[in-house]
């Protein structure tokens, strides 16, 4: 019933290192299979996956909330959905150029992020307690995804002990 069989898990175990330093990651699943995506999380010793999609539904196999949560749980990663940090899908229509994304994300920073500051602090708390936390959304490029903006704000908070890595 698990996504990966014993043999595959053993291979990942060999590559997997245990890290003690706190780290914030961002990861998109566009262009990745569920297996490859989970492998990346495991190799980087991610403890918590924070899904920052407004609607955790995907037509891509394995990435709807229930499926993704099950896949994570199966390999010992805790899955948390934080829709409050997401962007309404109607605001995501008609994004043709990088400029369109910039305009959308600037408005996202001024509205959604400001209004949901507590959820940003909640993610900070998760990093402080669980050490290895990844923010996830669809887009492959963080420049075309709001998870990059969430990460930017998390990196600007005072007294942080963690570093940022884009997977």
What are these regions (language model features)?
Residues 1-167:
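Residues lining hydrophobic/aromatic ligand-binding pockets adjacent to catalytic sites
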């Amino acid at each position: 019933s698990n996504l990966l069989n014993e043999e595959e898990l053993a291979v990942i175990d060999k590559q997997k290192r245990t890290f003690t330093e706190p780290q914030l990651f961002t990861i998109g699943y566009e262009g990745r299979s569920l297996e490859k995506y989970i492998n990346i999380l495991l190799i980087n010793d991610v403890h918590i996956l924070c899904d920052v999609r407004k609607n955790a539904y995907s037509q891509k196999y394995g990435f709807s909330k229930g499926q993704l949560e099950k896949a994570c749980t199966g390999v010992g990663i805790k899955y948390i959905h934080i829709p409050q940090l997401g962007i309404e899908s109607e605001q995501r229509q008609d994004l043709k150029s990088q400029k369109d994304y910039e305009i959308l994300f600037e408005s996202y920073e001024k509205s959604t992020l400001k209004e949901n500051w507590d959820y940003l602090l909640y993610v900070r708390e998760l990093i402080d307690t669980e050490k290895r936390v990844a923010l996830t959304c669809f887009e492959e490029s963080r420049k075309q995804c709001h998870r990059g903006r969430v990460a930017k704000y998390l990196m600007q908070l005072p007294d942080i002990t963690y570093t940022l890595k884009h997977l």
